[in-house]
Swiss-Prot record:
One of its GO terms (biological process) is positive regulation of pseudopodium assembly. This is Cdc42 effector protein 4. Residues 280-308 have a biased composition (Low complexity). It comes from Mus musculus. Residues 27-41 form the CRIB domain.
């Protein structure tokens, strides 16, 4: 498209050039659009192929022209032209503006009757065949509601009423009421037909959420079983594990005869006293054995065999967990004393 001449000069104080400078050479060749085939200026000047405008103007009656000229309501194009006229330069006089207003009315009458432009005249649009209207206007739900109620049909905005569609199914598919939708066969995939135009259903197939939740539940069950098993072990643990009671060390004397005498005195103690007081006779510690010497090995072996027999008979660990739980702890007998003053040098706690 060729570049138009500059309408405004570079100087700020210079006035806008007159529109008389516009010529037909400024209009480009037709490019497939009706806007490039002709031009109608604001002052009534027209360029290009305007034969259809003149033919329409000749066919119009004098009465229709008088009614349109004397109408109080101006057309849509005349309003636009008047609004654009206000944005023009203020330096023009009132006389020039009056001439412009008169030419605007004339040009509006010409353009109003153009076939390529929208219908602006209600009388001419009413005379047109209603079959040329789009199908959405002829099958509007407003018309259907009026026809169903038996009331008068309300005319459309352009004053035309469309013909009734013979096929109701096609009419519904094009544009119709929400309550009268055709019944569609059910799809084998389980999709439901939307009850409203604004709603729809989407089926994304089987979901993996069920598998994920089942795996999570299995993990939770395994952790709970482990916790229960651990708690059962903790409950049985203290009963099955026997804590080591305070050790009663028997320090053998330097002489073998004295050690035998002290061992006889220790063996004469009643077994229930050993059990009640929580004492256990064990073998002498390695430090004491090293300090005494090698002559005490025979006494220590006999002492360990005796203590093992006592533990097997009297220890609560060999009774079983049920008997241990049933037997209450017994307080030590304060009146009974198995340590004499003579044995304090030989037996010590």
């Amino acid at each position: 498209m060729p570049i138009l001449k500059q309408l405004v000069s570079s100087s700020v104080n210079s006035k806008r050039r007159s529109r008389a400078d516009l010529t037909a050479e400024m209009i480009s060749a037709p490019l497939g659009d009706f806007r490039h085939t002709m031009h109608v200026g604001r002052a009534g000047d027209a360029f290009g192929d305007t034969s259809f405008l003149t033919s329409k103007a000749r066919e119009a009656d004098d009465e229709s022209l008088d009614e349109q000229a004397s109408a109080s309501k101006l057309s849509l194009l005349s309003r636009k032209f008047r609004g654009s006229k206000r944005s023009q330069s203020v330096t023009r006089g009132d006389r020039e503006q009056r001439d412009m207003l008169g030419s605007l009315r004339d040009s509006a009458l010409f353009v109003k009757n153009a076939m390529s432009l929208p219908q602006l005249n209600e009388k001419e649009a009413a005379e047109k065949d209603s079959s040329k209207l789009p199908k959405s206007l002829s099958s509007s739900p407003v018309k259907k509601a009026d026809a169903r109620d038996g009331g008068p049909k309300s005319p459309h905005r352009n004053g035309a009423t469309g013909p009734h569609s013979p096929d109701p199914l096609l009419d519904e598919q094009a544009f119709g009421d929400l309550m009268d939708l055709p019944i569609m066969p059910k799809v084998s995939y389980g999709l439901k037909h939307a009850e409203s135009i604004l709603s729809f259903h989407i089926d994304l197939g089987p979901s993996m959420l069920g598998d994920v939740l089942s795996i999570m539940d299995k993990d939770q069950w395994g952790s709970e079983e482990e916790e229960e098993a651990g708690g059962y072990r903790d409950k049985e643990g203290p009963s099955s594990i026997v804590q080591a009671p305070p050790v009663l060390e028997v320090v053998p004397p330097l002489g073998r005869q004295e050690s035998k005498a002290s061992w006889d005195q220790a063996s004469m103690l009643p077994p229930h006293a050993v059990e009640d007081d929580g004492w256990a006779v064990v073998a002498p510690s390695p430090s004491s054995a090293r300090s005494v010497g090698s002559h005490t090995t025979r006494d220590s072996s006999s002492l360990s065999s005796y203590t093992s027999g006592v533990l097997e008979e009297r220890s609560p660990a060999f009774r079983g967990p049920d008997r241990v739980a049933a037997a209450p702890p017994r307080q030590p007998d304060k009146e009974f004393c198995f340590m004499d003053e003579e044995e304090e040098d030989e037996i010590r706690v």
